[in-house]
Structure formats: C-alpha cells, structure tokens
C-alpha cells in the first residue's frame, strides 16, 4: 500500500513517515527509495507483492460516511471498510458478441444490458440468501449493500471482434463496454431502490440519487471461474494460444484457444503443426505459415507491452466503482528497471493498483509452455487431427 506521501518522497529522493498500522502513530522518518527498491526486487523475484495506491483509492470512495477503507481483497480489486463484505460476479464478454455470416462481429448491447440487469438483481439478492460469519459483518455489509459486477473474457472477445489487444481500438471498446455496464448497473440499482428500498447509507438527504447498492462494479481476476466459462481471465489478454495449466495435484491440463482454431481452420492452416511449434514456446509471429492478419489479431500476453496493459487497465478503471485487478506479464529477461517504471507509470495514470509477473520467476508457475507435447498429441488425436 503506497501513499501519495510515499510516492512524493520517492520522486524527490526524500523521507516519509513510517506509521503504526494499528494506532496510526508516526514511528520514524525513513528514506522512500530503499523501501521501493525492496518492493521492486521482490516483485522481480517472484511477482509479489503487487501494489495498491491508498490515497488514489481513498479519493474515489463513493460513500466516505461509511468509514475509511481498511482492507483490500487479495487480488486488489475490492476495497472494503472494517467488517465489510462484498459479493462479486463477472460477465463473460466473449458470450456478448454477435457474429453473423454476412456481417462483422459486434457487441450485442441488448444482450449485455439484459445480462447486467439480471446480474445486479442476482448479486443484490445474495445479501438475503447468504449466511454471514458474524452479526457485525452482516450489519456493516448491509449498510452499503455493495456488489461488484465485473467482466471476464475480454481477450477472447477481441479475438471474435478481430481487434488486436494492443491497439487504440481495443482501448476504446474496453472503455465503451465498461462504461455501459456501469450505467446499466446504476439504472438497475436505482430501480431496485424504488422496488425494495435503498441501502441505509443512501437514505440520507445528502444523496440526491437513491440506489440499492453503494457500489456496483469491480473487475476481478477470475482466474478460476473463467476456466468454468471457457474464456480468458478478467480483462487480461489470452495467456497463450496453447499452454499447460498446472493443477494443485501437480498434474497438467492442456488449454487451447478455440477462437484461434476456428480462424486457423477457415484459413486452411496446418493446426497440429502450428500448435506443436507454439507448445515448444515459439511465438505465432515467428511462424511463416500464419497469415499476417491473424498474427496481428491473435496476440497473447507475451506480445503485449506494459504500455498497452496499462492503457487497457486505465480504460476499465475510469468506469469502475471499485478497482481493477490486472497483471502486466513480462518476459523472463525483464529487469528491475522495467518493473520500477510500471509501478511509477501506474501511479501517474491514476490506477488503484497493479501487479507484475516475470515469466519463470517461480519454479512451479500455474501457466506455462513446455517442450513436452504428449498432452497436445493426445488432444490432437482425440479431436481428429
């Protein structure tokens, strides 16, 4: 958790006050630079810690009368006051794209809007359907009835739309989609307030617009639920077109991107040969048999620069009540200076937090490519290749 004071001290090579996290009392003045260097070094070594920018978060608190934020979820997307909880859900954007033979793919805004309405009502109902860990948690949580509706499958949606993730068009579409979801969610929450009553914190005259929920949108990483939905995670680019997912048991699960398979089949490409090259760690851009227009669209996490990761995150954050969980993927040979610049740039862009991960910085990372093609061979055989 990095404050404005810390970041200012870092910029001017100065000191900042180290505070007791319980009492808030200043303990001592210490230089900011060595602390920041330690954070950067740890992130370079294994991806932890991610950072959040505490004062940026505090300035965007929609209901400060509830209290100051005291905790953040493990992936940085949901900020809460003490004893508060929040219910999250995510819409699969890949399922919100309409694609007809005669027309280019486009966002199905009507379907997306109907899904938002259903999701907001569903998430709000969880307050009555759930059993809370304590009466205090139940009471504090119901003061704001916060929900966090987010998205997943953005990377796959771009594939269907034939838009490169690392493009201004992708940034524009991200902004449009997330802004639309927020507007629709707010409208639904206002309708719910008329039907069922507003949340207690909005009952006061200080709030001109009554809503059922103090906050409505959050973008979580969705690393697990996106597996169930069969789409890319959160607002991340697709990790790889074919890769291995390491399970808790130590076994591996093969993941293949079916949007790429469909386009490769339409182009008459040798899918088994391409996938065998990719599982060995080659990039799509290196394969001469793949047309240039497919290389431009089917970019993966390893192809996206830090700049585009941050641009997409900012586009989403601008229209998200809470925060956006986002990881900047870096190659194995990335150095500490790159991570330092990512953290500084994220702060300057007004992001609420950011995480970086350098490929192979952990011995047993969950997602990877491997020279072992046995799982791919079995998959190709099972699918008739």
Tell me the role of every PLM-derived stretch.
Residues 1, 5, 27-35, 70, ...:
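Conserved active-site and cofactor/substrate-binding residues in soluble primary-metabolism enzymes
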Residues 1-6, 53-63, 136-147, 171-177, ...:
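A glycine-rich phosphate-binding loop feature that marks nucleotide/adenosyl-phosphate handling sites
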Residues 1-61, 65-67, 90, 98-103, ...:
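Conserved, charged catalytic cores of large soluble enzymes
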Residues 6, 10, 14, 39-44, ...:
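Structural signal for hydrophobic packing residues in well-ordered secondary-structure cores
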Residues 17-25, 93-110, 132-142, 159, ...:
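Glycine- and acidic
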Residues 22-23, 115-138, 142, 161-222, ...:
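Internal maturation/activation junctions in enzymes
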Residues 43-141, 153-157, 231, 236-258, ...:
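Function-dense linear segments that define catalytic or interfacial modules
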Residues 70, 74-79, 89, 123-128, ...:
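Catalytic alpha/beta core of large soluble enzyme barrels
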């Amino acid at each position: 958790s990095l404050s404005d004071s810390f970041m200012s001290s870092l910029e001017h090579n100065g000191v900042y006050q180290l505070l007791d996290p319980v009492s808030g009392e200043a303990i001592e003045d210490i230089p900011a630079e060595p602390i920041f260097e330690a954070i950067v070094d740890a992130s370079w070594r294994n991806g932890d810690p991610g950072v959040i920018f505490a004062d940026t978060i505090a300035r965007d608190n929609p209901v400060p009368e509830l209290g100051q934020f005291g905790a953040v979820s493990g992936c940085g997307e949901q900020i809460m006051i003490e004893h508060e909880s929040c219910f999250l859900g995510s819409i699969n954007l890949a399922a919100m794209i309409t694609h007809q033979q005669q027309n280019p793919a486009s966002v199905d805004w009507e379907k997306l809007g109907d899904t938002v309405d259903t999701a907001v009502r569903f998430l709000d109902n969880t307050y009555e359907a759930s059993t809370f860990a304590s009466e205090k948690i139940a009471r504090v949580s119901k003061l704001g009835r916060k929900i966090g509706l987010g998205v997943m499958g953005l990377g796959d949606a771009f594939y269907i739309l034939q838009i490169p993730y690392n493009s201004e068009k992708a940034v524009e579409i991200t902004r449009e989609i997330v802004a639309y979801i927020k507007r629709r969610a707010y409208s639904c929450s206002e309708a719910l307030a008329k039907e069922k009553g507003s949340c207690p914190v909005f009952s006061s005259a200080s709030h001109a617009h009554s809503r059922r929920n103090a906050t409505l949108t959050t973008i979580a990483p969705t690393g697990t639920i996106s597996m169930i939905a069969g789409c890319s995670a959160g607002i991340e680019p697709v990790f790889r077109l074919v890769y291995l997912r390491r399970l808790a048991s130590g076994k591996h699960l093969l993941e293949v991107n079916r949007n790429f398979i469909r386009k490769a089949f339409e182009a008459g490409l040798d899918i088994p040969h391409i996938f065998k090259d990719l599982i060995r760690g080659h990039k799509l851009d290196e394969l001469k048999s793949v047309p240039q227009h497919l290389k431009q669209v089917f970019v993966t996490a390893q192809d996206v620069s830090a700049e585009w990761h941050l641009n997409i995150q900012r586009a989403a954050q601008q229209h998200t009540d809470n925060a956006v969980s986002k990881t900047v993927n870096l190659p194995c040979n990335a150095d500490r200076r790159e991570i330092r610049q990512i953290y500084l740039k994220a702060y300057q862009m007004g992001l609420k937090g950011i995480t970086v991960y350098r490929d192979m910085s952990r011995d047993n990372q969950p997602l990877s490519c491997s020279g072992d093609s046995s799982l791919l061979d079995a998959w190709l055989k099972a699918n008739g290749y």
